[in-house]
Each structure stands twice: as C-alpha cells, then as structure tokens.
C-alpha cells in the first residue's frame, strides 16, 4: 500500500485534477469570456501549440489510456458537479467547464484523428474546490478512492498462490564482468 501511495506524484497520475483547476484559472486570466467558444478555442489552441499555460502542450483532464470514447466516471461526476454548481451559484463556472470540454474534444480529435474523451480528473478538481477542500488533499483523495481496488488485487494474488509478477524489461546497458565485493577498489562498483 505504501508503494502505491508513494507512486502518486505529478500531473499524469494523481495530480491531474490540480492541473485542471490551474488551467481553468489561467484560462480565466487570459480571456474576456471563458464561456465563449471562440475565445476558449483560441486559448486551447495556444495551449496545444505550447504558447500558453505551462508550455507542455497538454489540455489537462482530457484523454485516457482505456476510455477513449467516453469515461463513464466523468459522465457520472459531471451530473453531480452540475447539481452542486447550481446549489453554490457557480453556473457560469460550470458553463466554462462544459465549453472547455466541448472545444477541447473538437481540437484534440482534429489533431489526433481519434476521439478523445474528458476524464474524471477534469471535473474532480472543480468538485473538490466547491467543497472547500485544500489542494493538498486532492491526491490523497485520489488514492483513497483506489485503496479498495489495490487491496482486492493484493488479496487475489495471495489467495491464488500466484507467482510474483515481474514486468518484462530488456537491459540496454553494455555488459560488464562480474566483480566480487571483496575485489572492489573504489567506494562504488560503478566508479
């Protein structure tokens, strides 16, 4: 469990919802109307061209390795977020998210030639923000949601008396002769 938790760092896995919130704040600071499709398209095109946001060319909250047509988690979450945004009087903010989702799908599909779906990270940061949760808790919440699954996988491994899973890899390093520890002449065998 500790290894799983420690693996969560950065915008690709665990921190993407924070990047979405930051992207939306950046969008609002660079356009007059963040619900206007034309202005949003111009901004997102600049993001893709690495001329806006963090210069990485990524529209955060878009795309998934498995869910290419639609992320069912995002579909469900969108409904909850819409309801809460109405309760909180954040309809315009919700409209911005919907506009960004629509335009980003169009731009990314045109660029890649493949359908691109919004993922669960797109809406989760907005939800956490509406619930007044500190950004420092976004990744731990991401982890908590997965702990039952991680535990179930571990229980399956133990219950099936299965072999240790080892990822396949091919070493690309030049072969070196074995040197017994007693023969080391420097503090490190790599020196």
Stretches found by the model and what they are:
Residues 1-186:
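Non-transmembrane, aqueous-exposed alpha-helical and coiled segments at domain scale
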Residues 187-191:
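A short, hydrophobic C-terminal helix/tail in secreted or cell-surface proteins
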